[in-house]
């Protein structure tokens, strides 16, 4: 069966579902709803949704078919008028997983002493108490923060999945066994199926050191014309970010029809996130890599965009998820942007880091839009499409369920993080000083000739 394109919206009393099913016989459509589940079926289409609130299938519910547009327009009354159903635009999260498995218990559980009768009477009340987290002071570099608590709070719908070697949540293996050997110019790990995470980090740093070219960096430091044009470019997310800062935007983002179609087609996954902190942190290199490519192409992706994004993102090129702090990621992003792409400039790298902060601060919908853009680029490449299966499909689904407070904390700490040129372990200041001396000497020579 085919999952059709669909959209959802709401008002105070009703939920509206529009399903695109052209060339059908409307009389054969089967529609029903019970509590928060909605079913739509007409060969060859099937749609099963799980709404964030309950609806009623009573006399007020109705459906009509627009032959010209091919849409079935369905209306269900809300069980509780005035209730706001959140995230109706995050379509992937509404699709019911047809292959659900029972949630498996963790291998290790916390157990308590046998409760007394008085304890048992108060157990249900204690369980209902909301766990309080000081979101303002959460810090990604704090070794004492209980990331397992965040997992228990946010991932009630997620189920157990075995993990292995690389990719999102370190849960994939075997996918790069042959792909890495056939025209994959992004992959930088010689044996991705056999290389442990710590070794991947070491290989990444070593390759960056070997790739850094002082003359290339010197040339981009001296010749600023194209660099300045790139720095003055304003991407769409920066425009939106500036409006938000000025209080002129409410952050509401409406997905395009292409984005909605991509969301509906995303494979719905179930996860047990072993290391939530790591999943949030490894999102940053992806966003940075996109920000660099988007800025240097002035918003018009090229045939090199896949390579740019994949190579700049250590999450993809080196399968490196072995980061413990935001500063480690900052240094890795800056180093890669100064070692691999066409434009290698310190100011450009820092600007792309600021772009990363802007995207993260706009929230999960803008992050999702960026991930869908990256995913679309990789989807149409003969070799690099594999990274959708390893990284991008999962991130595009997971971000729809990510914790807004943690994303805000991540964005804040990205903005607060600073590094020096010395922390790249490359002689950037020395190179720049040599360029300045050369310029001064050249100017003095020109003046003496004129005299």
Curated annotation (Swiss-Prot):
Start and end residues of each stretch annotated as Disordered: 106-128
One of the GO biological process terms: box H/ACA snoRNP assembly
Major place of residence: nucleus
GO MF annotations in UniProt: unfolded protein binding
All residue ranges annotated as the CS domain in the record: 1-89
SUPFAM superfamilies in UniProt: HSP20-like chaperones
UniProt keyword Nucleus present: yes
Keyword annotations: Nucleus
Domain of life where this protein originates: Eukaryota
Compartment(s): Nucleus
Pfam family membership, one: SHQ1
An annotated GO cellular component: cytoplasm
Record carries keyword Nucleus: yes
Family: Belongs to the SHQ1 family.
Protein role: Involved in the early biogenesis steps of box H/ACA snoRNP assembly.
The name this protein goes by in its record: Protein shq1
Gene of this entry: shq1
């Amino acid at each position: 069966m085919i999952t059709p394109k669909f959209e959802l919206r709401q008002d105070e009393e009703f939920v509206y579902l529009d399903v695109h099913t052209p060339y059908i016989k409307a009389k054969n459509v089967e529609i029903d709803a019970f509590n928060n589940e909605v079913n739509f079926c007409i060969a060859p289409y099937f749609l099963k949704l799980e709404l964030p609130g309950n609806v009623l299938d009573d006399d007020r519910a109705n459906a009509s078919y627009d032959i010209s547009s091919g849409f079935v327009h369905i209306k269900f009354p809300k069980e509780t008028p005035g209730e706001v159903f959140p995230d109706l635009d995050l379509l992937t999260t509404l699709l019911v997983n047809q292959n659900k498995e029972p949630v498996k218990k963790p291998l290790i559980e916390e157990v308590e002493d046998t409760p007394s009768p008085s304890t048992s009477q108060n157990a249900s009340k204690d369980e209902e108490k909301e766990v309080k987290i000081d979101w303002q002071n959460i810090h990604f570099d704090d070794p004492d923060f209980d990331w397992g608590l965040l997992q228990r709070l946010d991932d009630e719908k997620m189920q157990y999945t075995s993990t292995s070697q690389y990719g999102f949540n370190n849960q994939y293996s075997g996918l790069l066994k042959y792909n890495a050997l056939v025209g994959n110019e992004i992959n930088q790990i010689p044996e991705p199926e056999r290389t442990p995470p710590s070794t991947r980090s070491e290989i990444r740093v070593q390759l960056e050191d070997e790739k850094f070219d002082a003359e290339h960096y010197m040339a981009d430091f001296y010749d600023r014309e194209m660099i300045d044009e790139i720095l003055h470019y304003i991407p769409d997310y920066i425009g939106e970010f500036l409006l938000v800062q000025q209080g002129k935007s409410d952050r509401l983002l409406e997905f395009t029809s292409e984005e909605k179609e991509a969301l509906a087609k995303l494979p719905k996954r179930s996860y047990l996130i072993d290391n939530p902190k790591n999943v949030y942190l490894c999102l940053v290199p992806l966003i940075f890599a996109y920000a660099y490519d988007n800025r240097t192409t002035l918003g018009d992706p090229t045939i090199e965009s896949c390579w740019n994004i994949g190579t700049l993102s250590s999450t993809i090129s080196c399968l490196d998820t072995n980061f413990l702090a935001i500063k480690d990621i900052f240094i890795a992003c800056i180093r890669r942007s100064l070692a691999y792409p066409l434009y290698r400039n310190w100011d450009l790298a820092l600007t792309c880091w600021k772009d990363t902060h802007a995207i993260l601060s706009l929230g999960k919908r803008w992050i999702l839009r960026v991930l869908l853009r990256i995913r679309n680029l990789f989807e149409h490449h003969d070799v690099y499409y594999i990274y959708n299966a390893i990284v991008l499909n999962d991130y595009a689904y997971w971000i729809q369920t990510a914790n807004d407070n943690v994303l805000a904390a991540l964005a804040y700490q990205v903005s607060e993080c600073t590094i020096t040129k010395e922390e790249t372990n490359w002689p950037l200041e020395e190179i720049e000083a040599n360029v300045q001396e050369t310029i001064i000497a050249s100017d003095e020579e020109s003046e003496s000739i004129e005299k």
